[in-house]
Every structure is written in structure tokens, then in C-alpha cells.
């Protein structure tokens, strides 16, 4: 046996063929071992076992007389390229992306951020079945805002939904400095905490042998709306009519909204189906309107009298002028302001109209009548002129012109002219003018005009979708936050602002915020700060002090912290007003913070700022603060850019502060004192204006 096996493969193969099989068949002829039956060669192997072409034997070259194949196989082996060096054939991107996972096409005039946003949502966030809806052409703006583009995508799970929305908000903030808002988004830790609590409740219930109530716990909402806001500020042409349906004002720019769903929630809501139906209805409505206008016959309008063109019309190609006779021989012309009509066109019931122009305080009724005498001007401009003139009058005269109250319409020349102009206005213009009158009267502390009537007029304008500008909206808030006058409720009621008035002001601010008005600015927060400084009742508010003697937990301090936390855009004019309010409210730290921010925000301190600084310290009368203020800031005046000269009213206020800090400063300076206050006192005396 050993001799047979030692003969190599030939002996083994013969043995296998000769062995009978117990199963009725012989063994396979091919051995299970990979035995190479070829003889040993010193040359390379003819065929590679790993090569795909090894199954076909190489044929000798017929031109070779000796039939030598060694040379041919050597050449083929040298030309063989291994698999790891072969270049892969590039696969078309359209084959890689299925039909349900493709980036939608961009609409016309799309913002520059849209293709980048779609690419990020598709590739980085991994949302599937993206759908883009262009809602900019809708006649009725959607609740999410006008000129909106909506992107709808599907997330793979609830966790993927929350993570994608969070990453998208962070990407928009960091890359494009936007302020997106994700409605329905749970924070990174909030979702983990809720899931952990839910699992804990399930374990406790299982131990007790009960089941957990499967009600909506707010975790698996399956829908997150990421509103990126206005991504491109493009001017929108002002429409002729402001009577539009929908929410908010007509704003410029395009806003982008990304709607993220889970697969089940998207099928349940079918948001794209709802919006596609709305877009189709709007398209049909527009088509019907176009067809109606095209089918309507064109009416030909001709003048009743012959038209005679002037020579200037032939030269410049202008439109022909009509020879219609204007009433009372009135002629139109181009003027910088409205032209006064003749005395024959005025109402003779007011005696003050024939007395000429006298804008002195003694003849304010004549000036009021003069401002309303321009009958050829637009009535809205006339009411604005009347209100502007009223705001320039002293308080006593303004209260006299406003009459007895809101029901009074003809007791004064101002009211007669104002309501006469209202009678010739449209309903929208009259309602807005009435709101302006109420704001002016309430700000002047007129007892006949209530804040409830102003709120009613404001809600009426909103109900009829009348246009109220942002400036008028802030003016309404300012009127709502006007404190009660000193004569109402006795001397102790000075500066009292009831809680009901604050609530009305906050409701107005909430409405302005919902329609898109920017209320996070220093002007609004200055109004809130002044309102917080007033007590809500006659007894006042108890001031809580800590062990150091400083006040804490005051409403004004909370508003100041809110201003600092929100990092509101710096407004130099409103910042100076807020500084004065903070100083008079004993918030000295807030005052100095804003004072130091003036030059850092591109608003250098001026002579008026230093005049305000020293005047406030002189009115305060605190010896220590007056000394520190003069010693620190009087020398810095010459170091400002540009330098502040030591002259004018600022010199008087500095001297008052020095007298508060050191009453005997004049004697000390005369005696030759070299103290800091004495040197500043001498400089002020040298630059003080001479008294005649």
C-alpha cells in the first residue's frame, strides 16, 4: 500500500477507480485535493488559476512551426492587470438615486439659498421623498407667511426626525445667520428624558400588573415644521389695494419652510395633497379672471366737448387735455404744498378763517382752522396735519382742542375740521384716523378718551383687515402704557399703571408679532421698561432688598436682564432714552453699561451726552456719585473722538456736580488747592460764559 501511495497522483487515482463503492456507485474521478498533475517547469506558470480566462486552454500559434506556446503565454501574462489596479467604470448618478429619492426641480426666481438647502436636506440630513411647493403665487397668503416656498420630506424614525430638525436649525443659524423656529421640535436631551420616563412608567406598571395608558404623550408627534423665515429680501411692488385676505401684512422677500414627517404621519396628514388642491384652485381662479377680462368689450370713452390740443402736446407727444370746465374756475398746477382756496369756498360758520395766519399760542384755534382749510388736498393728509399740529401744542391747549370726550365732534374748531375730513374718507382711512386721534388723546392724559375705546378701535381695524402700519402699532402700545395723570386718584396715584392696561398693551404686541412686526427692538423694550417702573395700584410696590442694600426682583431689573440676554440690535437714539430712564429708576449699573456701549457700537459720545450725564448727577444730589462722575469723566471729554470742548451748558452742570461733592470748592481753589476737583473747577470758571 505504501508503494502504491508513493507513486504520486497516478497511483492514488488508480486506487480510487479500483475501490468498489458501498453505495452502489464509484467515487468521483476528480480528487478533492488540488493536485497539480503538470511537471515542474523553471518558467512561469502558463495559466493563472485566479484569472477568469483560465478555463480556456491557450492554443499554439499556427504560424509557429515548432508549436511552441511558451513565448505567447509569457506575453499574455505580462499584459495581465490585477483586479485591484483595474479602474472601475463610473456609475451614472441617475442610477444611484431612485425615482422616489431625487432632489426636486427649482422654481423660477428662486432664492440663492434654496439649492444649497435642498442639497443639505437631501444628502446631509437624509430626508426621503422630497417635495417642493411654490406658494408665492397664491392670492391668499398662507398662515405661515406670504411669498413662501414649502419643502416636504420624510424621516426614517422619530429620532431621525428630531435630530434632522435640530441639525437644520443649527446649520441655518451658523451658516446664514438666520433665526429659524422649529415647531414641534424636542431638544436633544428632552427627547431622551421623556423616553426614559416613559420606559420607567412602563416598568413600574408591569411590576404592578397594570398597563400604561397609551395616550398622546407629546413624544411621537411625527411632524416638525422648521420655519427659516425670510431668506431673501427682495422688493415687492406695492399693490393698489391693501384689502387682501390672509394673515399679516404684505411683506417683501421669500420665506422658506421645511415640513418634516415620519412616513405614517405624512400619509395621515397628506399636506402636499391639501396644498396642491389650493394651488390648483388658485390657478383656475386666475384663469377665469383672465378669460373674463379678455372677453369683456372695450368701452370707448370720448369727451363731450371737442378736444383742442395745445402746442406743447404736439412737441412732446403728451396726452390730450380735456376742455372740461372745473368747478369754481379751479386750475391745477404743480406746487410744493397744497394751495389755499378762495374765501368763497370755505364754510362761513367759523369766524377764525378770515383772520389770516397766526400760529401763536394765543390764536391756536385760528392755526387749527388754517391747517384744515386745504380742501384740494387728500383728506388723510389733512387729518395727519391736524394731528401733527395738535401734538405741537402745550398740554392745556391740546386738551381744550380735544373737547369733552370721544362723543364730542363739534365743540372746537379742531374737532369740526377733523370729523368733517373723516366724513369724506373711506371706511378704512376713517378708522385708522380715529385710532390716531385716540392715541394722541390718551397720551395727553385726556379723561374723555379711554384705553378700552382704543382697544375696540384696534380690534375693529383687525376684523376688517384695515392696514395699520408698524409705527402706528407701536404708538398704540405706547398709549396703552401711558400712566395715569397726577390729578386722577390723588397725589399718591402719580405714575400708576393698572394691570389691565398692561395686559391690553401685551395683547397688541402679541398681535403685531403674529403679523410679522419686529418687536424685539430697543424702542419697544424702552416702553416696557418705563411701564415696569410704574406701580400697579395706589399703594405702590414693595421693594425687596438683600443684605447688601441693593434692590432685587424688581420688574425693571427683569426687563433689563431680558434686553441683555436677547442681544437686541443697538439703537443709539433709543439707547440714550433708555439710559435716562434707567438712571432715574436708580438702575445705575444698567446706565453705565449702555454708556460704555455707545462708542463700541459706532455712536461716539457727544456734547449732549456729557451734558445729560452731568445734569442727571446734579439732579440726583448724591455726593459720592457726583465726585466719581466729575473725577472720572471730565478729563475724558478731551480724549473723545472728536474731543468734547469744555464750554456751554456742560460747564454749568459740571460746576453743580462739584459743588455737591465739595461745597467749599471755591474757597479751596482760591487758596491754591491742587486737588483734582479744584483743577477742574478752575478750568470751568475760565470757560464759563460771562453773565451780563
Swiss-Prot record:
Q: Which portion of the chain is the transit peptide?
A: 1-73
Matches recorded under InterPro entries: Atp25, NT_sf
**GO annotations under biological process?**
mitochondrial gene expression; mRNA stabilization
Q: Has keyword Membrane?
A: yes
Kindly list the places in or outside the cell where this protein is found, as annotated in its UniProt entry. Mitochondrion inner membrane
User: What membrane topology does the UniProt entry give?
Assistant: Peripheral membrane protein
Enumerate composition-biased segments (Polar residues): 65-81
> Its GO CC terms?
mitochondrial inner membrane
Q: Does the record bear Cell membrane in its keywords?
A: no
**Bias (Basic and acidic residues):** 292-302
Which keywords appear in this protein's UniProt record, sorted alphabetically? Membrane, Mitochondrion, Mitochondrion inner membrane, Transit peptide
According to the record, the residues making up region (Disordered) are 44-83, 286-314, 338-373
Comp. bias regions, Acidic residues: 347-357
Q: Which family does it belong to?
A: Belongs to the ATP25 family.
PANTHER family this protein is in?
ATPASE SYNTHESIS PROTEIN 25, MITOCHONDRIAL (PTHR28087:SF1)
What biological function has been recorded for the protein in this entry? Probable mitochondrial mRNA stabilization factor.
User: What name does UniProt use for this protein?
Assistant: ATPase synthesis protein 25, mitochondrial
Q: Which organism is it from?
A: Neosartorya fischeri (strain ATCC 1020 / DSM 3700 / CBS 544.65 / FGSC A1164 / JCM 1740 / NRRL 181 / WB 181)
Amino acid at each position: 500500500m505504501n508503494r502504491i501511495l508513493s507513486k504520486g497522483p497516478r497511483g492514488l487515482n488508480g486506487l480510487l477507480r479500483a475501490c468498489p463503492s458501498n453505495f452502489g456507485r464509484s467515487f468521483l474521478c476528480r480528487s478533492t485535493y488540488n493536485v497539480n498533475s503538470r511537471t515542474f517547469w523553471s518558467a512561469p506558470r502558463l495559466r493563472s488559476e485566479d484569472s477568469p480566462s483560465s478555463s480556456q486552454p491557450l492554443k499554439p500559434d499556427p504560424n509557429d512551426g515548432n508549436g511552441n506556446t511558451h513565448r505567447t503565454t509569457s506575453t499574455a501574462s505580462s499584459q495581465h492587470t490585477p483586479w485591484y489596479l483595474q479602474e472601475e467604470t463610473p456609475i451614472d448618478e441617475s442610477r444611484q438615486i431612485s425615482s422616489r429619492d431625487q432632489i426636486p426641480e427649482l422654481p423660477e426666481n428662486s432664492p440663492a439659498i434654496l439649492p444649497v438647502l435642498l442639497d443639505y436636506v437631501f444628502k446631509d440630513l437624509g430626508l426621503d421623498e422630497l417635495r417642493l411647493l411654490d406658494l408665492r403665487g397664491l392670492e391668499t397668503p398662507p398662515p405661515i407667511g406670504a411669498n413662501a416656498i414649502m419643502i416636504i420630506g420624510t424621516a426614517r424614525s422619530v429620532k431621525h426626525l428630531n435630530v434632522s430638525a435640530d441639525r437644520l436649525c443649527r446649520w441655518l443659524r451658523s451658516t446664514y445667520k438666520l433665526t429659524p423656529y422649529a415647531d414641534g421640535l424636542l431638544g436633544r436631551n428632552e427627547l431622551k428624558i421623556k423616553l426614559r420616563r416613559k420606559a420607567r412608567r412602563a416598568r413600574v406598571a408591569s411590576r404592578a400588573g397594570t398597563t400604561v395608558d397609551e395616550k398622546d404623550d407629546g413624544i411621537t408627534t411625527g411632524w416638525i415644521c422648521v420655519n427659516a423665515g425670510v431668506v431673501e429680501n427682495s422688493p415687492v411692488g406695492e399693490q393698489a389695494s391693501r384689502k387682501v385676505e390672509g394673515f399679516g401684512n404684505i411683506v417683501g422677500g421669500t420665506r422658506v419652510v421645511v415640513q418634516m414627517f415620519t412616513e405614517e404621519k405624512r400619509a395621515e396628514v397628506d399636506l402636499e395633497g391639501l396644498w396642491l388642491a389650493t394651488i390648483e384652485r388658485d390657478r383656475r381662479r386666475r384663469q377665469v379672471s383672465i378669460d373674463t377680462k379678455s372677453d369683456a368689450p372695450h368701452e370707448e370713452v370720448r369727451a363731450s366737448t371737442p378736444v383742442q390740443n395745445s402746442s406743447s402736446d404736439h412737441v412732446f407727444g403728451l396726452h390730450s387735455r380735456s376742455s372740461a370746465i372745473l368747478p369754481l374756475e379751479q386750475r391745477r398746477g404743480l406746487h410744493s404744498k397744497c394751495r389755499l382756496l378762495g374765501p368763497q369756498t370755505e364754510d362761513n360758520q367759523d369766524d377764525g378763517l378770515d383772520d389770516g395766519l397766526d400760529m401763536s399760542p394765543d390764536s391756536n384755534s385760528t392755526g387749527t382752522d388754517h391747517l384744515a382749510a386745504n380742501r384740494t388736498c387728500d383728506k388723510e393728509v389733512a387729518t395727519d396735519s391736524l394731528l401733527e399740529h395738535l401734538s405741537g401744542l402745550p398740554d392745556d391747549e391740546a386738551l381744550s382742542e380735544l373737547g369733552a370726550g370721544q362723543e364730542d365732534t363739534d365743540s372746537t374748531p379742531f374737532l369740526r375740521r377733523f370729523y368733517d375730513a373723516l366724513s369724506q374718507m373711506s371706511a378704512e382711512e376713517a378708522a385708522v384716523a380715529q385710532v390716531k386721534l385716540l392715541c394722541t388723546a390718551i397720551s395727553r392724559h385726556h379723561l374723555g378718551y379711554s384705553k378700552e375705546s382704543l382697544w375696540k378701535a384696534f380690534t375693529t381695524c383687525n376684523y376688517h383687515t384695515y392696514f395699520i402700519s408698524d409705527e402706528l402699532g407701536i404708538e398704540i402700545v405706547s398709549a396703552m402704557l401711558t400712566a395715569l395723570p397726577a390729578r386722577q386718584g390723588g397725589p399718591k396715584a402719580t405714575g400708576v399703571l393698572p394691570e389691565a392696561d398692561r395686559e391690553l398693551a401685551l395683547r397688541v404686541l402679541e398681535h403685531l408679532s403674529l403679523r410679522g412686526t419686529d418687536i424685539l427692538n430697543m424702542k419697544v423694550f424702552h416702553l416696557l421698561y418705563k411701564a415696569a417702573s410704574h406701580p400697579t395700584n395706589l399703594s405702590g410696590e414693595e421693594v425687596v432688598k438683600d443684605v447688601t442694600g441693593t434692590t432685587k426682583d424688581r420688574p425693571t431689573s427683569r426687563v433689563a436682564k431680558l434686553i441683555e440676554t436677547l442681544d437686541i440690535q443697538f439703537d443709539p437714539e433709543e439707547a440714550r432714552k433708555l439710559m435716562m430712564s434707567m438712571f432715574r429708576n436708580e438702575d445705575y449699573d444698567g446706565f453705565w453699561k449702555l454708556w460704555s456701549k455707545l462708542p463700541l457700537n459706532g455712536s461716539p459720545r457727544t456734547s449732549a451726552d456729557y451734558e445729560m450725564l452731568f445734569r442727571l448727577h446734579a439732579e440726583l444730589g448724591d455726593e459720592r456719585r457726583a465726585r466719581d462722575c466729575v473725577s472720572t469723566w471730565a478729563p475724558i471729554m478731551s480724549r473723545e473722538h472728536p474731543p468734547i470742548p469744555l464750554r456751554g451748558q456742560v460747564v454749568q452742570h459740571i460746576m453743580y456736580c462739584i459743588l455737591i461733592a465739595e461745597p467749599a470748592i471755591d474757597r479751596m481753589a482760591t487758596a491754591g488747592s491742587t486737588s483734582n476737583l479744584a483743577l477742574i473747577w478752575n478750568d470751568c470758571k475760565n470757560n464759563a460764559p460771562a453773565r451780563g
